[in-house]
């Protein structure tokens, strides 16, 4: 059952939304510049202590701590919430909370991106507890917006003055679907701040600071946080990479990066079903294809291409029962290879096959299994 505070958030969010309708860096120098700009914008940090702050940030985001900018640290490039990840936002005794239980709000203006506003009850003039507005650049709260992408919105913790106010960057294109930025999802997150919630370190939580596509779903961390009682941070609820029982749903390269998929893939690809079984990249088309059962999806970036999912039988010519057989499909000829078992294609030295917690290294020339390893050996785990 949802806590009372989350019920308040969802109720306030519903009224608000009715009123408005529904690469990674190429050089190390660019990486450093991105990190320094991020720290300056959100943490008032100079170059002298930036290494320490990077370590703290990476611990918060669940990344490997090195104190140096790297590909993992570049999560900073993603669109994000503008509230700094500092301790005073945690719901613990002594931190600000609304003293009264009946809160008023007022929407100062509307974004023209979403049409057909509906009738709702609001404070039409004067000062409300929660003032909601769409603004650009410097809007006199010491946290100017930075244009399209980057800082999407921010909200103040409960208190007098601007306390509880939520500001949305009008330079963004707000939508009611998953093109650009979904207003419902961002508003739900920001109104959580307006009611006193902190950021969560659980990547599956609504209160995780980085914007992720997908339907609004409350994680256990979201539900536990607003209970009103001091709670210890739950931390990321992601699988432990060195767990000896760890398995993967799918593995493939994506734009030069090796990607391991496990559960929650709809956080990045909201139109792709959970429970993937296989994936591969077509780099020359900038597409990744995901397979589940007899269906597959073609994805570019985070968007599923038009007309997908499709059926593997009609598209590739798979028989109705594949079972334990191995097949090769020629993307250029758009047909299955013939004589596949005798003429294994490819020019790699070997290929790896994953099944459960194991990975098999297959030699293309001898057509034999060379080694058997744990599937998570890619993560420098000790033997377990």
From Swiss-Prot:
Signal sequence coordinates: 1-25
Gene Ontology molecular functions: metalloendopeptidase activity; zinc ion binding
Gene Ontology biological process: collagen catabolic process; extracellular matrix organization; proteolysis
Residue numbers binding Zn(2+) 2: 81, 189, 193, 199
Superkingdom classification of source: Eukaryota
Cross-referenced SUPFAM superfamilies: Hemopexin-like domain, Metalloproteases ('zincins'), catalytic domain, PGBD-like
Enzyme active site: 190
Residues the record lists as binding Zn(2+) 1: 139, 141, 154, 167
Cellular compartments annotated: Secreted, Extracellular space, Extracellular matrix
The enzyme's E.C. designation: 3.4.24.7
Keyword Zinc carried by entry: yes
Keywords: Calcium, Collagen degradation, Disulfide bond, Extracellular matrix, Hydrolase, Metal-binding, Metalloprotease, Protease, Repeat, Secreted, Signal, Zinc, Zymogen
Binding site for Ca(2+) 2: 129, 161, 163, 165
Activity control summary: Can be activated without removal of the activation peptide.
SMART domains, per database record: HX, ZnMc
Catalytic reactions on record: Cleavage of the triple helix of collagen at about three-quarters of the length of the molecule from the N-terminus, at 775-Gly-|-Ile-776 in the alpha1(I) chain. Cleaves synthetic substrates and alpha-macroglobulins at bonds where P1' is a hydrophobic residue
UniProt cross-references to Gene3D superfamilies, sorted A to Z: Collagenase (Catalytic Domain) (3.40.390.10), Hemopexin-like domain (2.110.10.10)
Disulfide bond residue pairs: 242-381
Pfam family, one: Hemopexin
Note describing how the cofactor binds: Binds 4 Ca(2+) ions per subunit.
Binding-site list for Ca(2+) 4: 249, 277, 347
Similarity section: Belongs to the peptidase M10A family.
Name of the protein: Interstitial collagenase
Organism encoding this protein: Aquarana catesbeiana (American bullfrog)
Lineage per the UniProt record: Eukaryota, Metazoa, Chordata, Craniata, Vertebrata
């Amino acid at each position: 059952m949802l806590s009372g505070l989350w019920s308040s958030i969802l109720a306030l969010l519903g009224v608000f939304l009715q009123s408005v309708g529904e690469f990674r860096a190429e050089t190390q120098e660019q990486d450093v510049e991105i990190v320094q700009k991020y720290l300056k914008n959100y943490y008032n940090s100079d170059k002298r202590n930036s290494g320490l702050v990077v370590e703290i940030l990476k611990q918060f985001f669940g990344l490997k701590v090195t104190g140096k900018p790297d590909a993992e640290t570049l999560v900073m490039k993603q669109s994000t919430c503008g509230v700094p990840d500092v301790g005073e936002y945690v719901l613990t005794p002594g931190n600000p909370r609304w003293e009264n239980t009946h809160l008023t709000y007022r929407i100062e203006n509307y974004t023209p991106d979403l049409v057909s506003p509906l009738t709702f009850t609001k404070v039409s003039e004067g000062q409300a507890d929660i003032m909601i507005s769409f603004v650009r650049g410097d809007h006199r709260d010491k946290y100017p917006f930075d244009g399209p992408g980057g800082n999407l919105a921010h909200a103040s913790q409960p208190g007098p003055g601007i306390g509880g106010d939520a500001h949305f960057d009008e330079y963004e294109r707000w939508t009611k679907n998953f093109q650009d930025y979904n207003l419902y999802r961002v508003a739900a997150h920001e109104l959580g701040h307006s009611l006193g919630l902190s950021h969560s370190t659980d990547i599956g939580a609504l209160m995780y600071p980085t914007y992720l596509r997908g339907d609004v779903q409350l994680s256990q961390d979201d539900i536990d946080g607003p209970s009103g009682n001091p709670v210890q941070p739950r931390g990321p609820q992601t699988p432990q990479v060195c767990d000896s029982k760890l398995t993967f749903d799918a593995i493939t390269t994506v734009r030069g990066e090796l990607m391991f998929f496990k559960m929650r893939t709809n956080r990045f690809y909201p139109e792709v079903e959970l429970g993937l079984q296989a994936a591969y990249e077509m780099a020359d088309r900038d597409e990744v294809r995901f397979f589940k059962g007899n269906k597959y999806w073609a994805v570019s970036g985070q968007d599923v291409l038009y007309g997908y999912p499709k059926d593997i039988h009609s598209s590739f010519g798979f028989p109705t029962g594949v079972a334990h057989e191995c097949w090769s499909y020629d993307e250029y000829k758009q047909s299955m290879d013939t004589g596949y078992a005798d003429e294994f294609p490819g020019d790699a030295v070997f290929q790896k096959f994953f099944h459960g917690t194991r990975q098999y290294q297959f030699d293309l020339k001898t057509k034999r299994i060379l080694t058997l390893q744990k599937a998570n050996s890619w993560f420098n785990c000790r033997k377990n």
